[in-house]
């Protein structure tokens, strides 16, 4: 297949859809759709979102030193898109979408109670990169619906029905597709064929329901040393 050189642009597939909850200086709860974001550190557990200074959420995070990151399900796709279309300076996004603001018990930030789960974060670091500033939040807790918990007692993507954004190359929202294989397992045969019987790194580490009760790294699975 012929390869084509393209100009640099912010494109990856896929992107998580992340709804960032904050309080303003006036105490008003706000919610926005952050296009750029994801997990950025295992210990301490951290998530990052990148925001423009023009957004209300940018200023709210600096004021409150906290934010939440909620993961919407497929039934929230219209609401998730809406909160990225209008500004909290002019709209009450919780009221407009019918989502219910719930104050986090761990940080000074709201979350949408209808979302399957939300990360509760204190502002850990922030760095201006250019047009965007990256806000790194230390995850102090997770508030989740009991019925979306799966292996290790954590939210399961098949149960949360989390949605994905196709990115700059395909500006649509998508549902999670078919399961292809278990991470840190499906490549075992290939590794054995290339390296003999060396121990395989990774795989399930905790029996179901025992997450957090074992000593060891805080991350859910061990990453290969690459």
Regions found by a protein language model. Name each.
Residues 1-218, 226:
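Basic, polyanion-binding surface patches
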